[in-house]
């Protein structure tokens, strides 16, 4: 058996009912021993690898479409297609398939698509072919009923399709449509609508080629205007002929290409606007219509790519200063639609498409267009740029780095994009949101290439911070020259929030580039000015920026923060927020809590030494008292290194206990009844101090009342505080070398050593414990950050007992948190 080789593309249908291009190669047919039968083989033209090996199954339904397509299904959800470059090759392979299956090559389908019951199959096979009634006005109702009754059965659909095709019935129907329309025969027009709609559901390429021909397509659209479900006919033909005009911005010399564009537009219009929304059943029956449109689009893109004169003229006129504004607007819109058109293509086709545009100079052309005054032209150019960035950000990076060697910073492509983002006139900044997303893609190291010769990340980030970062941060720097934002309107705040979002992304991903920029330009101080904004979302963006910096635990950043006293605006914002429990309050507390939990020693000391006076009255969370405790522990370790070593030994000893010991102790704890405790007795788990339920159940209303009483005091402290003097901040305290006691610490008699429960602490140590031994718990588990104060009676009892230097009741034990 001689092999016939033809150039083909192999496609598979994905879950979204879109065709995926699997590659280009040459097809042959031959006997394959492994399959014990004749098979189709496609080998890639690039490397000879096997793209397809498919046995020609005698029971598989193969379809020939558009003279150059063969489509079939190999499994329930696995459809394949071969798209031939030449009709002759398609015919030869089709003959081979029909020869194996014993079918007539003149048919376009070899099998029934869906299996039917044996009785139905026998009845249909034994009956003669479908006989269509004469195409006459008085027989339209009979024909409509015949079509409707044939659609549920695949065999009857096939027979109906063959009868309609062989008798040239479509053209006869269209002639009858003109008669009915001239006579205003509404009933006849309704029947013709049902018949034409049914012919679409026959899902047959040969019928589509007749209906979508230049002579018939407008009449087919006319037939579909008279939907019986609508009181008045639609005016689709009027729209297509009078409203929708084909603008040839660049003359298309190829008449076949022009015809293909017209046909595809009209068929797409039929699918989207004319045909009623299909049911799930009908959707599957329109698969051939989807394929018809898809392959038409592939052909159009390929023909335009191959027409070098067309693309050369397009880019030449785009960048020519002599081109008038209206013409340029049409050219840019065409290019935008061309790029949008490519999004329906599969990756291989799309790669070839954008590679062609890149070779033709699309990026230099965009640079020229973005520098023009026409807002609509610039907006269309921005959309084109987004397609390029999404397709291949490395291509865009390479271009902008090359142009930086020749052009000034003001006209660099990325800087033009940043300027458009800054100057977005949309009140909701829709364009700016799109552009900031593109910039993030460009500066994202995750999609940057690294080769043996060069590292794209290093080169591009060096370029970006040298030539572009000052343009991006300009609005931020211009608006933060004073202690509060110069402009605090909603649109400006939105823009600054977008810029801060990108800067925060840079902090997380760019290491030393962004670090040098922040420290050298004092960016964090400027950003923290925005915490005074009246827009909470902007203040939170500023806090998030600082939180990301602190989260890096980088001592360069920490020294920069301490040297410039950059916690001052944060504490100002915290005190100005007062007793309101909102995102601002939570974000600031979480920032300090992170410093405490992660034991960032330098920042802990800085906060306590400079701002303790402003924070010591904040007692509804343990965060600040915990920071003070951390600080005192640090000082104690500095003063007594031996004690630090002993605590380390005790801590390690505790960690070595096995799990069963811990479980037994927990069980004892939960079995202990609070009523069994004597006055002043304390139940302490091995590693934690405990609070009684009274502390947790005190009414929130009483707590809120106390906070309101403290509000004037907080504001008075803030008013007296002068944050302007960086060298001598008003919150700074002078600590002597002697050991200090936490404000929440009980007398020495109630202190606990980290080693064992109930043992007295070391002399003079107060209620100190190791960092791993300070989480506050109750019988129900760990307590959150909020710790409600005790009632007045307990405070009086507390004062009396302190004067007697006796152990505190459980409700007044020191609240420690690590």
UniProtKB/Swiss-Prot annotation:
<dbReference type="InterPro" id="IPR011989">
    <property type="entry name" value="ARM-like"/>
</dbReference>
<dbReference type="InterPro" id="IPR006887">
    <property type="entry name" value="P4R3-like_central_dom"/>
</dbReference>
<feature type="compositionally biased region" description="Acidic residues">
    <location>
        <begin position="788"/>
        <end position="804"/>
    </location>
</feature>
<dbReference type="Pfam" id="PF04802">
    <property type="entry name" value="PP4R3"/>
</dbReference>
<comment type="function">
    <text>Regulatory subunit of serine/threonine-protein phosphatase 4.</text>
</comment>
<dbReference type="InterPro" id="IPR055236">
    <property type="entry name" value="EVH1_PP4R3"/>
</dbReference>
<dbReference type="GO" id="GO:0006974">
    <property type="term" value="P:DNA damage response"/>
</dbReference>
<feature type="domain" description="WH1">
    <location>
        <begin position="1"/>
        <end position="100"/>
    </location>
</feature>
<dbReference type="Pfam" id="PF22972">
    <property type="entry name" value="EVH1_PP4R3"/>
</dbReference>
<dbReference type="InterPro" id="IPR016024">
    <property type="entry name" value="ARM-type_fold"/>
</dbReference>
<dbReference type="GO" id="GO:0030289">
    <property type="term" value="C:protein phosphatase 4 complex"/>
</dbReference>
<protein>
    <recommendedName>
        <fullName>Serine/threonine-protein phosphatase 4 regulatory subunit 3</fullName>
    </recommendedName>
</protein>
<dbReference type="InterPro" id="IPR051137">
    <property type="entry name" value="PP4R3-like"/>
</dbReference>
<feature type="region of interest" description="Disordered">
    <location>
        <begin position="718"/>
        <end position="818"/>
    </location>
</feature>
<dbReference type="GO" id="GO:0005654">
    <property type="term" value="C:nucleoplasm"/>
</dbReference>
<comment type="subunit">
    <text>Serine/threonine-protein phosphatase 4 (PP4) occurs in different assemblies of the catalytic and one or more regulatory subunits.</text>
</comment>
<dbReference type="GO" id="GO:0072542">
    <property type="term" value="F:protein phosphatase activator activity"/>
</dbReference>
<comment type="similarity">
    <text>Belongs to the SMEK family.</text>
</comment>
<dbReference type="InterPro" id="IPR011993">
    <property type="entry name" value="PH-like_dom_sf"/>
</dbReference>
<feature type="compositionally biased region" description="Polar residues">
    <location>
        <begin position="721"/>
        <end position="730"/>
    </location>
</feature>
<feature type="compositionally biased region" description="Low complexity">
    <location>
        <begin position="736"/>
        <end position="756"/>
    </location>
</feature>
